[in-house]
Amino acid sequence: MSATPSHIPVLVNECLSLFADRHPKFFCDVTVGAGGHAEAFLSAYPSIVSYDASDRDVAALSMAKEHLEKFGDRVHFHHASFEDLSKDPREHVYDGILADLGVSSMQLDNLSRGFSFQGDDHALDMRMDVTKGITASEVLHTLREEELGKIFREYGEEPQWKNAAKAIVHFRRRKKIVTVRDLKEATAKVFPSYRLRKKIHPLTLIFQALRVYVNQEDVQLKVLLESAMRWLAPGGRLIIISFCSSEDRPVKWFFREAEKSGLGMILTKKVIMPTYEEIRKNPRCRSAKLRCFEKKFL
């Protein structure tokens, strides 16, 4: 996550401390956002001569370019997904790679992007890269009931996945689901009363599932993890920050398998989470989990 007036980068000090014993020269930030983590690394480590900053969100990348302008030619920007990056040849291997997964506060707060259930009259888009791909609204209208249920179950871990899918298919027969309000109406009777009384909005997991599917986040993450092992220099470190179990589980599993295979070692034997103080200042960071893997030296 990145720094703007409405957005605070998560676990910054913890990220920086993982390189305290190093003088990184080449760094890759595959989710630069508006540049919060990038600014911290470039300021803390003058040794970084090349910082590759990429993001699939063109709006975020534009903010990053403005925010990081003061670092001049130390920063190189790329509009790319993890999959796009995997196809491009690397000019050099990296001492550090950072990925801050999920949706940012910038994206949530911009209601026109459709990531938030607060923007009733806004379209259900949810694309990280608005230049390509299908929208969440299109997903809700083209997939069969069984397919929608699978998405809600696997990507959102929504207990009411079957009822939600059934309600949406029934609703779309008489009205197109275009806006956030439409989806709320379609699922109005799905959730049990105790879910409606909780602080967490009952549609949270449905929105999460749709976002993951629309942006192919599971596929993108798999590509990133596999590519990062090639991109890292010997002794290089990969930091992944995740915000839900569907993101954290594959990272945890991949790191374990990589360690067993002799590719390197897990530096975060115990996952790093935000302190109470950080959560107090930035409640949205409460579910963040940081894991770090070090590629073995030759």
Swiss-Prot record:
Q: Does the keyword Methyltransferase apply?
A: yes
Cellular component, GO annotation:
cytoplasm
Q: Which CDD domains match?
A: AdoMet_MTases
Q: Where in the cell is it found?
A: Cytoplasm
Listed InterPro entries? RsmH, SAM-dep_MeTrfase_MraW_recog, SAM-dependent_MTases_sf
Residues recorded as binding S-adenosyl-L-methionine, renumbered to this chain, are G35, G36, H37, D55, F82, D100, Q107
Entry EC no(s) = 2.1.1.199
- A Pfam family found in this protein is Methyltransf_5
Q: Please list the reactions this protein catalyses.
A: cytidine(1402) in 16S rRNA + S-adenosyl-L-methionine = N(4)-methylcytidine(1402) in 16S rRNA + S-adenosyl-L-homocysteine + H(+)
Q: Which protein family is named in the record? A: Belongs to the methyltransferase superfamily. RsmH family.
Protein name per Swiss-Prot or TrEMBL? Ribosomal RNA small subunit methyltransferase H
The record lists the organism as Chlamydia abortus (strain DSM 27085 / S26/3)
